[in-house]
Amino acid sequence: MSKISNALGRKDGNSGYTRVVGNAELGQLLSRVQATVISNGNELERLITQRCNLIENIDVFIEDTTRGNNVQNGVYLCLKKTFKKSKKYAESVKGIEPDMLIFIVESYRVCKVIELKDGDAFDTKKSQGEKEHLEKFATLFGAKIPFVTDYYICSFNQNDKKLIMAGFKGVFSLEHILTGKELCQILGISYQEILDIRRRDTEENFAYLIAEMMKIPEVREEVKKHF
């Protein structure tokens, strides 16, 4: 989980939060909370990738796998930033790259095209756009590699696939939905470990937010009215 203590937020005192609450200090603090929420997706990806077998060069990996050049059976993860450096595959799918690609190398070869979400509720237009990009990427990229390829949307923090489907306005069918636990099972990493780390960060965020709020004189005065 990202930490409020590390977030900058708006420094000019003119954030929407300041206009809503009428207090520059509180508005700036709330803008830091929002910045933390936005950065949570990147922090989640970092926690996942730290525990995986990362592909450093997708072109070399696919060529070595195809030719049987010392690629051991296992599960490998390719991030968007790595894929975008590809000289063989990136151009035809430019602008629709997914967050991650999981390659399973066994007696069969599978590529899972995955968009990772920290939340689970999106509007219809955004949901439809996500699906169209995933479908197109899986079709175009899948046609060029010797892997059975399919796409998935993953809502890491929701364990009920039907609720995920509802959150994406029914755009994704159940077979194209992954929970966070399922994603971690595929990658061979501990879902619970990631939850525990994020839970500790959540507790720290709560304590930090309250402490920072109580530094604001107007907040302290308002709190006194209720006790």
UniProtKB/Swiss-Prot annotation:
What biological processes does GO assign it? DNA restriction-modification system
Asked if the keyword Nuclease belongs to this entry, the reply reads yes
Q: Which UniProt keywords apply?
A: Endonuclease, Hydrolase, Nuclease, Restriction system
Q: Which GO terms describe its molecular function?
A: type II site-specific deoxyribonuclease activity
> What's the superkingdom here?
Bacteria
Query: What EC number(s) would the UniProt record show?
Result: 3.1.21.4
Kindly state which reaction or reactions the protein catalyses: Endonucleolytic cleavage of DNA to give specific double-stranded fragments with terminal 5'-phosphates
Q: How does it assemble?
A: Homodimer.
Protein name, per record:
Type II restriction enzyme HhaII
> In which organism is this protein found?
Haemophilus parahaemolyticus
Q: Which gene encodes it?
A: hhaIIR
